[in-house]
Amino acid sequence: KRQVLVIGGGTGFYFYQRQQPRKAVENFLDSMKKMDFNTMESMIQSSDLTALDNADIRDAAYTDFFSEINKKMTYKITRNRFDIQNGTASVTAHITYIDGTNIYKATITEFLRQIVSNAYAGNQLTEEETQAKLASILNEQAKKVEKDVFSETDITYPVIKTDSGWKIVSLDDETVKIMSANFKSVEEEINNSLNNMDNEDSSGSSSNAPEASADDTLNLTT
């Protein structure tokens, strides 16, 4: 009888431990939906979320937009590969998230149109005013969307057991892409477009604002 209890206890311990990596990933993904950066940071072994800043996700100017986008994300854990001896696991999540490609393209086109209009009128905005205008247009374009467009992806998170519990090893690029609705940085694309306009002006070309059509592929990498 005692042997049965020992075996039963060992099995129970194993299944309990097996669920911990899964719960860690679920906690991380739930905090993504809520834009709870403190919890996200606590669930990352390196505690490094700087990639979110590179995508402007933690910029206060865009909080409303990204909060609205990320709360619509859903997920389902589809696989949990667990190694109790090494204290490691690989947890796969199937994630459905907002694809903001058309929102960004419409925002960039409208923003550049207004910038050119202000330039012709002799109005020069400060950096703060420019960012506020961009954030406002982004929110306006998001509200105009009649039906949300979703994308799906599978991410396998490497998870490791630490002294303070199970942690995801590091923040990956795909997760950042999800949180930013499929783009790395709208500000970077704006800067690239403005630089292109400056080059056109210096070469004597037309200074009309370029349009981002529905078929364009915007490259937001440096």
Which stretches of residues belong to each language-model region?
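Hydrophobic membrane-insertion alpha-helices, especially the h-region
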Residues: K1-G10
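Short, aromatic-enriched amphipathic alpha-helices that serve as compact interaction elements
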Residues: Q17-D36, S193
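Solvent-exposed, acidic/flexible segments
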Residues: R18-P21, K33, A55-D59, D148-E152
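Extracellular, surface-exposed passenger/stalk and repeat segments of large secreted bacterial proteins
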Residues: S31, M35-S42, L171, V176-I178
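Short beta-strand edge/turn micro-motifs at domain boundaries
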Residues: E110-A132, K143-S203, T217
